[in-house]
Regions:
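FAD-binding core/adjacent interface of flavoenzyme oxidoreductases
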Residues: 1, 71-113
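Beta1-alpha1 glycine-rich phosphate/pyrophosphate-binding loop at the start
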Residues: 2-72
Length: 113
């Protein structure tokens, strides 16, 4: 029935995808779109910087985990959101139509303010 698209597969988008897939019946499609094919647990970055952890211990490939739960995954940067037509244009030229859109791309920090 409905196609729910979530932009961003970080600490907001990934759990949102899991929850939606769990709560909605299989007639609905849930798709996560993320510029990278990996999840990085950002709170662990200081541990990596100090040498307490390796990068491989704080990142993992998203696709196998999402697809195991019935969530579609597109590893591609979104260029534009065409809200009037419910479409997302991706960096590779593909277009993804949606019925509902969740934007969970994280903050843009303003260090210069």
């Amino acid at each position: 029935m409905a196609h729910i698209v979530i932009l961003g597969a970080g600490t907001g988008g990934t759990p949102a995808g899991y929850e939606m897939r769990h709560l909605l019946d299989k007639s609905h499609t849930v798709t996560l779109i993320n510029a990278s094919d990996t999840f990085q647990f950002v709170p662990s970055n200081p541990w990596v910087a100090l040498g307490w952890r390796e990068t491989r211990e704080t990142t993992f490939k998203l696709r196998p985990y999402l697809e195991k739960k019935g969530i579609q995954f597109i590893a591609q940067r979104a260029d534009t959101i065409d809200a009037p037509h419910s479409r997302i244009h991706l960096a590779n030229g593909d277009v993804v139509d949606y019925d509902y859109l969740v934007i969970a791309t994280g903050p843009r920090l303003a260090f210069d303010l």
